[in-house]
Amino acid sequence: MLARNAEALYWIGRYVERADDTARILDVAVHQLLEDSSVDPDQASRLLLRVLGIEPPDHELDVWSLTDLVAFSTNSQGGSSIVDAISAARENAKSAREVTSSETWECLNTTYNALPERERAAKRLGPHEFLSFIEGRAAMFAGLADSTLLRDDGYRFMLLGRAIERVDMTVRLLLSRVGDSASSPAWVTLLRSAGGHDTYLRTYRGVLDAGRVVEFMMLDRLFPRSVFHSLKLAEHNLAELMHNPHSRIGATTEAQRLLGQARSELEFVQPGVLLETLESRLAGLQTTCRDVGDALALQYFHAAPWVAWSDAGQRGQLVGSQEES
């Protein structure tokens, strides 16, 4: 597979996941701000912007200014707004039409073309419908990719990108709650933002506890958005890309080593000590995500720099642009 196609598919996976996760987080935050008068809108908005890696403005924030920054801003710092993420996913799909299905392309293209109308409706009726639209389109894209794409290297690159983005987003969510009390309602907000509230309640029979929430989000083997599950998925797809499933010496590349090390540390950690070392462990996982991106760029993408949240917008969105220059 051409390096530009591999990289485009990898970033399609990341950008669609980024748009989906950002919509989920913003939707929960907006509901909280509108329904709970005890929450300070400016403080809560700044915390959310910090989670998403967006530089907060100097003026005071409310629901509407927060929505404009997170959902509708273009050329955002880090390319982390929902509109920018969808635009970038669509541009990458456009550059790799020969390795994507018509259905997945039409899904992204239709979503992109509907953004202006959906934005106007959101400013009249509120942001919930827009955010639900993004979540639904991301789910549709995932379903179409699952049902129409060959299980080849391109599909594996897309899943690899999605898995790494999920690790990064879950880590950011947990970092925002470091230092909160065990009984803080913010833990419920975290679970809702990750789409795991109902699953958590079924798993732990409705008992809300900070330690269990951290265990669930970090270690659960069955919840698809947990850090462990996402690392395992990334590690599996990278191993499939290596085309050497029976290697007698284990990890042969830097990306494999980094993912395997992060996964094994979580696999054998004592759950009871997670809260005690949470901040340092999360910081280490963020570093791992960045280093894995660098290693993949060197190994597969002709050493193209990894697009971090802080410089994604400066990348120009279209992966293939470097090939053309």
Model-derived features: where do they sit?
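Alpha-helical transmembrane segments and their helix-helix packing motifs
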Residues: 1-325
